[in-house]
Amino acid sequence: MKFSIIIPTYNNLDSLTFLINSLKKNSSFDHEIVLHINDGSDGTLDYAIKNNIKHTHSVNNIGLCSAMNKAYHLTTSNYILYAHDDMFFCDKWDLFLIEEIDKYDHNLYYLTGTNISTRFGLINHDCGNSISNFDEEKFHLFCQNDKTPDLQGSHWAPHLIHRELWDKIGGFSEEFNPGDGSDPDLCMKLWLSGVRIFKGVSKFKVYHFNSLTTRNNKVILNNGSKTFLLKYGINPRFFRKHYLRGNISIIPYIGILTNPIKNISFYYDLIKCKLKILYYKIVNH
């Protein structure tokens, strides 16, 4: 089974090559890698051309959502995997993902990897804070011994959906450029298309160096929570809590989801969302 791995990148060549090397080293199959290169004047564009890596290119940073949609047109696999350019994939990651995919006789699922980091990961385990001091052996040893269960309601990269779903929902919503709020928006579109399996596969681990690309290039983020709220009438936190039944921390996988439980907590949080919408309408009037 082959995946199409889309990687948007913005002048982050050292981290990108580190990621691609991990994919080549730790994959059991020869997956398709497709880049979208924003700018690329640091040598990224030359690297992609020299190594015959599929890529799209923009002179300026067009944002995560537009980058994903543009690169998607070069993909050929039925399985679309989105990854950050500052990750390191664990050994046999693809076998763990394939094992999960083989459980289903349909494609209504959204599967994610488990982020490991020094901080801000789903699991915090210090294997280094940059590629220069990354302890690969320590990371692989942790992956082999970790007993963390599969996770509920995860909506973090790397994540995989089927091509048919991507086409049905139209990929990423470009009103969320440069990218804040784009992942929960993607999940909401999947939810509205009938997806009820939102699962983090514990064995599929990546080490994440904390979005260095965004910080190093001083990208000004959009207000994704506001855009999501005005689009759907609820904020991403409400969606994560009451629909996905997940959190930014570890919650063991509970299975196929049902519609939200409309209890006191649901209505209390919903009222807060509606008041926030009213506030935005008054302020923007």
What kind of feature is each model-predicted range?
Residues 58-75:
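Glycine-rich, basic loop-to-helix element that forms the pyrophosphate-binding segment
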Residues 21-30:
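Short, acidic, metal-binding catalytic loop of nucleotide-sugar glycosyltransferases
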Residues 129-152, 156:
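Short, flexible, basic/aromatic active-site loop/helix in glycosyltransferases
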Residues 152-170, 176-204:
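A short, conserved alpha-helix in the catalytic core of glycosyltransferases
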Residues 116, 177, 199-219, 227:
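Active-site donor/metal-binding and catalytic loop motifs
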Residues 29, 37-45:
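A conserved acidic beta->alpha catalytic loop
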Residues 91-130:
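Conserved donor NDP-sugar-binding/catalytic core segment of glycosyltransferases
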